[in-house]
Amino acid sequence: MKIAISYPPIVNQEGQKAMVSQNRNVQFFKKPTYLLPVIHAQAATWLRDLGYDVLWDDGNSQEKNFDDWYKDLIAWEPDVVVLESTTPVMKFYWSLIDRIKSHIPKSIIVMTGYHSMRKPEETLLESSTDVVLKSNHIDFVLKKLIPYIDEHENWRSNCPIEGLTIRRDEKEFYDTGNFRQIESLDLSPDVDRSLVNWKNYAYENGNFLQTPGAYATSVIRDCMFGKCTFCRYNGPDLTFSMRSVNKSLDEYQRLIEENGTKEIFDDSGVWYRGAEARAFARGIIDRGLHKKGCYFGFNTRFGYLDEETVSLLSRANFRFILVGLEACDQETLDRLDKGYSVEDAEKNLRLFSKYRLYPHLTIMVGYYWQTRQQLEKTISTVRQFMFSGLARTLQVTLCTPLDFTPYHRECI
């Protein structure tokens, strides 16, 4: 059975490529930027380990244009095509799915992603999609679904795997119930870096000061906080799962010693905190990985790391600390349910800077309530943080309503 895990090149009128994976807020990049879809890469590895013929088909990182990517996919004639999408590009995907079905009608199309998982019937009605995964645990579900399809001709009628909406025919859909919210992440394999052509992601990424870099297998799936109104990792249908410290340390050691990786970034919604964060830093030091010329980085929240932890992280050669500032007026922070103030942010930035970490600020603009005065306050405060040395780098994006988050529903 042949399975393609596919990411088509999506280019807008300005020549910018859409990145639909590993993002809390969809982005279009003019400068080449290739982000490894970690959970889908774990799924690809798991299916390959089960004996399936897996094609890692990321047209973006392979620098293909759309026509070449599409031609190659159709020529391979996969039995299953797994796609991932998000709100701003759903119509593109619906059209693409119908086109794929017109050329390889027997292929089973599986849609993943936070937009379709929250409204699966929409994607089934708007396209020829066969299955919508309602789970964020793509790897765990595909590991069960693909063998079931392979072994049961009537899989559409009686599939017992939870967290799916399945097309029985043109108008009838079959829902298998809620997905399992918490999984034991240690059961999912580390990403096979050769399978996903890891070097395609190792250089063109602004998060890396040194290359080759790599995204680690995430230690937290989704987010421990899970309340920010704009973020897809939000809602009563989601919680978080955690990977063990030792399993993650083993992967870091392999990435450094076998792949020669010079920077490792963990793109978990929010990385470890407290005891796990300190244990991880001590593990890096105990294994001598902090002396291998490799930097480490992760996402966190203001207020999640105390001074003892930050000190240990600094000793362990952590560098890049990505934190979501989002805005610098309290009304916006409260409406986004961020759970901190600008004063809290400044206090944390001073702590990071004291221990020579490199805070990277993420800011968004374009909130539907945002006034010029609020925007100017954000600009002036961020300028102060940057020019006083409290932050090293920053990125600014438009706040895009997506994936039926609370912010998206407010905008609707």
Where do the model's predicted regions map?
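Hydrophobic/aromatic residues located in beta-strands of well-ordered beta-sheets
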Residues: I3, V54, I109, I161, ...
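Short glycine-rich His-centered loop
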Residues: I3-P32
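Flexible glycine/acidic-rich beta-alpha junction loops that bind and position SAM and/or redox cofactors
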Residues: N12-Q16, G274-A275, E331, R335, ...
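Short helix-capping segments at alpha-helix termini
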Residues: L50, S102-K106, E153-N154, I285-G293, ...
